[in-house]
């Protein structure tokens, strides 16, 4: 072990600054302790007060979100949020980002991101039933991007498939702004009975703190601080800040923890995942939530490396570890339970009532600080914000109108854009069927899983078009929530609530912080209008490479409930001669669109204001029509407009369509919001048109083959087979390029 600097040396050399603490924060710690903090204590404060653990820069933003509703059983503040779905059951879900680690070590970064979010779900007492992921990369023409993409996908499928939780959905987009800073956001969904909900608390004087799972190593030390800094190309050496995951160990940990929660409620007090900032974070949070204090004895912590310092043990982010609080005297029983799963459980401390966090090592006290100072009292900053220069420039631009010579060729080109193209090559590597509950496979608007023992099903999706947020963070934020809800509704489900991963640049730059601040207003407004509170989430700031920030990317994960499995709907046209309807009006919405990107090579301009009331009305009508059994298929209109939505609806069952739209050709590719493509059996035509009224435009019918779309001044005409092949092969073709 190295000789640790003395408190005086730490202060004089400003060592704390290397760990991310400012001078003001260091002085605040001195005031709290009434002395200079020692080496270990300085380390504890530096991670617990990092943005990643304390949300010190984003708390004022998060206050904007609605977090309550009649269906919400647990909002933000625990491992994950919980929503009631009736029948004594609830759904538990949360999303997490693992962006910085995945940029450095893409396979392990993505795999441990999946592992961490799964632990958050089962620490609540829920059985994880599904994984989704939201990924962002640079352009696939770049060799390093292809490597990152391949490894991240392999890491997600490697972990998810081994632990036996199906990866059922997600979304992937490619933009130059993610070149040096990919985004890897993972979402996990679990099921729980109301009477088995578990909280992460450590209370009751003398009760024991048990450490369970994998041994502690030196991996991931300062991972939380690493995630709270900007990225520079030189940082690819920071591999020790990336952890290595073991999905087989996690599978045992999952079963053991659920066994403990289900069958030993009498002795279990609290349970929490050791995630960011490892042991210090989980133990301090558990004590702080319960208003208790703690004593930890580090000599008892299972270690897989020799001569680890207290600092290293407390900050290690080794994977597959949980912290459990149990009744005094029950330690042996818990250890034996974990032994039956081949896992180690060790008592490493106890609960006190004095509110102090005391850590012993080698018979000496190495840290003695107030619990709340670590977990609750990090400073909160109201950052300065100002509208970016580009917004003023956008206001001066005339709206972009595409020039189209051949609509058929344009549709083919759009279908091959990586953001629109089929992601089949990705989701085929995921096991989406393990557990055998998956009813709607990846590739439709939302994934759907049935809830065993009931007639219900759950729909889930992740969504965000960051181009819209780049043009207008507030409207873009509204659209992200609205599109997620549209996907849930198109699958026949009632939207319940959201989780979010807020991926942004540095909060220290007023223009970046303005993006976070204003997009939160948009997200909050849409959540209120659509009745989907924010029940959990994660903030990932400092997503910049060499000073260039990513587009603002608030990934919205949404879950909805389908009361009766007979109402499950997919985007695929079902039968020849079914009628095709367009719900919602089409306007000249080309700014931020896929066609603008193709024709200009960039996106620019303003977004038209977005009518949330109309969005809500259209969603309610479509859901009603689905629930009364009048709809054969439903698909939301998104990137690429009506033309792409129609083509996608034809692909799954390789059918065709004959459609006539009273629009000029460019409008076939407009990305106006609040629109759906529905197909309806001719026998339901009258009932459907009576129910939907003027909102529905009957535009054509499903045919055996061929995509034929008539605009006022052009016709799209191509074979379904050819178009589908272009759409399916686009990403595999790009991946085969040589560097």
From Swiss-Prot:
Subcellular localization: Cytoplasm
Keyword annotations of the record: ATP-binding, Cytoplasm, Ligase, Magnesium, Metal-binding, Nucleotide-binding, Purine biosynthesis
Residues reported in the UniProt entry to bind substrate: 97-100, 119, 243, 317-319, 540
Binding-site residues, Mg(2+) 2: 120, 273
Pathway assigned to this chain's UniProt record: Purine metabolism; IMP biosynthesis via de novo pathway; 5-amino-1-(5-phospho-D-ribosyl)imidazole from N(2)-formyl-N(1)-(5-phospho-D-ribosyl)glycinamide: step 1/2
Pfam families reported in the protein's UniProt record: AIRS, AIRS_C, FGAR-AT_linker
EC number: 6.3.5.3
Broadest EC class assigned to this enzyme: ligase
One cellular component (GO) term of this entry: cytoplasm
GO molecular function, one term: ATP binding
Binding-site residues, ATP: 55, 94, 500, 537
Annotated catalysed reactions: N(2)-formyl-N(1)-(5-phospho-beta-D-ribosyl)glycinamide + L-glutamine + ATP + H2O = 2-formamido-N(1)-(5-O-phospho-beta-D-ribosyl)acetamidine + L-glutamate + ADP + phosphate + H(+)
Catalytic site positions: 52, 98
Main location as per UniProt: cytoplasm
Family assignment from sequence similarity: Belongs to the FGAMS family.
Record NCBIfam families: FGAM_synth_II, PRK01213.1
Quaternary state and interactors: Monomer. Part of the FGAM synthase complex composed of 1 PurL, 1 PurQ and 2 PurS subunits.
Name assigned to this protein: Phosphoribosylformylglycinamidine synthase subunit PurL
Species assigned in the record: Enterococcus faecalis (strain ATCC 700802 / V583)
């Amino acid at each position: 072990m190295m000789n640790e600097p003395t408190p005086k040396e730490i202060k004089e050399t400003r060592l704390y600054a290397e760990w991310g603490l400012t001078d003001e924060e260091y002085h605040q710690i001195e005031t709290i302790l009434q002395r200079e903090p020692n080496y270990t204590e300085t380390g504890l404060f530096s991670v617990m007060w990092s943005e990643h653990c304390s949300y010190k820069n984003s708390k004022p933003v998060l206050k904007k979100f609605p977090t309550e509703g009649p269906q919400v059983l647990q909002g933000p503040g625990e491992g994950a949020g919980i929503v009631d779905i009736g029948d004594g059951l609830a759904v538990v879900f949360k999303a997490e980002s693992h962006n910085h680690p995945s940029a450095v070590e893409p396979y392990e970064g993505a795999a441990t991101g999946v592992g961490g979010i799964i632990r958050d779900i089962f620490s609540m007492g829920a059985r994880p039933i599904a994984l989704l992921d939201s990924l962002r990369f640079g352009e696939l023409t770049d060799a390093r991007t292809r490597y990152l993409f391949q490894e991240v996908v392999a890491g997600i499928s490697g972990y998810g498939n081994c632990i036996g939780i199906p990866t059922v959905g997600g979304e992937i987009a490619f933009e130059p702004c993610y070149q040096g800073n990919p985004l890897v956001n993972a979402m996990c969904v679990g099921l729980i009975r109301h009477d088995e909900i578990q909280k992460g608390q450590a209370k009751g004087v003398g009760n024991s703190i048990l450490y369970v799972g994998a041994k502690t190593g030196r991996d991931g030390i300062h991972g939380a601080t690493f995630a709270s800094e900007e990225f520079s190309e030189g940082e690819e050496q920071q591999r020790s800040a990336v952890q290595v995951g073991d999905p087989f160990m996690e599978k045992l940990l999952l079963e053991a923890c659920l066994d403990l929660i289900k069958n030993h409620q009498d002795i279990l007090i609290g349970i929490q995942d050791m995630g960011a900032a490892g042991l210090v974070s989980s133990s301090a949070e558990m004590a702080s939530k319960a208003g208790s204090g703690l004593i930890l004895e580090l000599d008892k912590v299972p270690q897989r490396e020799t001569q680890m310092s207290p600092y290293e043990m407390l900050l290690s982010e080794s994977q597959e570890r949980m912290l459990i609080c149990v009744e005094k005297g029950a330690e042996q029983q818990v250890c034996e339970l974990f032994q039956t799963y081949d896992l180690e459980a060790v008592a490493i401390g106890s609960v006190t009532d004095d509110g102090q966090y005391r850590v012993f090592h080698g018979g000496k006290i190495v840290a003695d600080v107030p619990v709340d100072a670590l977990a609750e009292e990090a400073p909160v900053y109201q950052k300065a914000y100002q509208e970016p220069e580009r917004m003023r420039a956008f206001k001066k631009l005339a709206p972009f109108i595409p020039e189209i010579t051949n609509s058929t060729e344009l549709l083919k080109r759009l279908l091959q854009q990586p953001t629109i193209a089929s992601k089949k090559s990705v989701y085929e590597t995921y096991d989406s069927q393990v557990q055998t509950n998956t009813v709607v496979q990846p590739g439709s608007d939302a994934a759907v899983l049935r809830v065993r023992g009931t007639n219900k099903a759950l729909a889930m999706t992740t969504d965000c078009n960051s181009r819209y947020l780049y043009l207008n963070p507030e409207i873009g934020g509204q659209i992200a929530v609205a599109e997620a809800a549209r996907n849930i509704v198109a699958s026949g489900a009632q939207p319940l609530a959201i989780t979010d991963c807020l991926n942004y640049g540095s909060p220290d730059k007023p223009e970046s912080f303005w993006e976070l601040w204003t997009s939160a207003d948009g997200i909050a407004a849409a959540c209120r209008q659509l009745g989907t509170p924010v029940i959990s989430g994660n903030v990932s700031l400092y997503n910049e490479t060499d000073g260039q920030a990513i587009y603002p990317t608030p990934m919205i994960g949404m879950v909805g409930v389908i009361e009766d499995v007979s109402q499950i709907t997919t985007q695929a046209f079902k039968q020849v001669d079914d009628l095709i309807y367009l719900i919602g009006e089409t306007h000249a919405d080309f700014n931020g669109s896929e066609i603008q990107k193709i024709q200009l090579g960039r996106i620019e301009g303003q977004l038209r204001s977005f009518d949330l009331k109309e969005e809500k009305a259209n969603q309610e009508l479509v859901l009603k029509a689905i629930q009364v059994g009048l709809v054969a298929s439903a698909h939301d209109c998104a990137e690429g407009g009506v033309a792409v939505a129609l083509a996608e609806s034809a692909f799954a069952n390789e059918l065709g369509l004959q459609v006539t739209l009273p629009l000029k050709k460019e409008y076939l590719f407009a990305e106006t919001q609040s629109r759906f493509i529905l197909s309806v059996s001719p026998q339901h035509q009258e009932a459907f048109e009576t129910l939907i009224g003027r909102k529905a435009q009957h535009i054509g019918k499903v045919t055996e083959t061929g995509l034929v779309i008539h605009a006022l001044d052009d016709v799209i005409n191509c074979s379904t087979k050819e178009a589908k092949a272009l759409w399916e092969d686009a990403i595999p073709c790009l991946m085969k390029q040589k560097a």
